[in-house]
Amino acid sequence: MKIRRRIATEQSQGVVRSFLRVAQFTCFILHFTFSSAQPTVDTIIDPKLATVLLYPQIGSTVDNAARTLNVPVLNIDDQVNTPLVLEFDDLTAVYRNFRVKVIHCNADWKRSVLNDVEFTYEYNDNPITDYQLSISTKIPYYHYRYTVPRMKLPGNYVLVVYNEQNREQILFTRRFRLYAQRIGIAAGVRFSTDISRQYNDQQIELSLDYRAYQAQVTSPQDDFKVVIRQNFRDDRAVTDLHPTNVRAFDQVLEYRALDLRNTFPGGNEYRYFDTRTLFSRANYVEKISRLANRNVAYVQAGRPRSTQAYTQFDDFNGLFVIDHLESHNGAIEADYAETIFTLLIDELPGVSVYANGAFNFWALNDRNRLTYDAALGGYRGTIWLKQGVYNYNYAVTGVVPPISRSGVGPTIGNEALVEGDFSQTENDYEIFVYQRPPAARADQLIGYQRINYGKRK
């Protein structure tokens, strides 16, 4: 009932804005092109392609299920020993010829004006030739693997995978970043200094030391573009930060909390479930139905947590890993299961509910939408997911998020309504610093720092 009362006060102002955001997002996907005027996003356009993974191959992690917890952010000098690896599945179970191209982007993820030869060492249009057919799975698929070639410049990049038979048919895109550590970054996380949000938000304060890079700096307060991202999510990023103090003698820029744009909603620890085996129930799986042509996994029914006290537990901060408990060869032996999500909550008029996570690139669409079931007394939906351990949460559209002075851009979904926001939540933050050197034609990523708040021992 508390949630229904909150909706009554917020819905009138939020429904129009939320509708416009969803409509704009939908139109963007339908008219997906790579012009210099449009941003590039993580997205899967072909519904038969699934489980798109991109990660740095650290050491001998090829058989380590946790390898996908390494996000695609890499020091440019480590590309030889730690290449980026792309993996994905084709559920048509028919071999198809795929090709991949790399696009260079500026700090705002709009395509740069650079020609291929300016940022690549090799020919920038390659076939994906490493593939395997799944073994003993009820849902057959081809598993593809591709090692990303080295790039010349630090910055933002997008992998574009397309149909070899039709170069205009883009199938999916995946972002990655290469950085060169040319400046020093010192950062920390604390509760928000906004009294009204001190129990809900987290505040990141940082400073940049550019003494070793000063020859490339002409206007310190304007040259650097700072981006802060929460939990590896580009939909949870602050992009328009300006220094609050310029210490010219020390060549240091400080970013403090004068306008509170450097704050983030704390969120909650992510829910999770384990389907590494389909022969018995594992953590947060209520039931496994082993049918002749498929497996069905029922995730434990959830309830709203926004009105409850914060509870501490470990998670992957929204990520997931693919694994097959019996063989530990999840790439080709993990099966796809019809995964049922259930949220027990009163019907929310004019509101759409979604099961959300990195498995869906944090997009809210028909694939992860839940529908209300009066007999069940809650919302239920089905998503086909490969065996593994998944983090997720529940998000809604139709209600604007709580008012916050955070600089996080307008988001499509409201996660606070069901999950709540707590300043105690353990979160990862990444700081990206971009700059365009004199005479350069594109932005470069010249600094990167990852910090954690509330890590459990």
Question: What residue ranges belong to the model's regions?
Answer:
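Low-complexity, Pro/Ser/Thr- and charge-rich linker/hinge segments at domain boundaries
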Residues: 42-49, 177-201, 420-447
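Long, internal scaffold/assembly segments composed of regular secondary structure
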Residues: 217-309
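Aromatic-rich carbohydrate-binding modules that target alpha-glucans
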Residues: 113, 118-142, 234-242, 338-387, ...
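Bacterial Sec-dependent N-terminal signal peptides
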Residues: 1-40
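Contiguous beta-strand segments within globular domains
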Residues: 51-102, 197-210, 329-341
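Ligand-binding face of N-terminal immunoglobulin V-set domains in extracellular IgSF glycoproteins
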Residues: 140-164
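Short acidic/polar inter-strand loop motif in beta-rich domains
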Residues: 152, 163-170, 278-282, 398-418
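Basic K/R-rich, polyanion-interacting modules in nucleoproteins and related proteins
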Residues: 298-349, 451-457
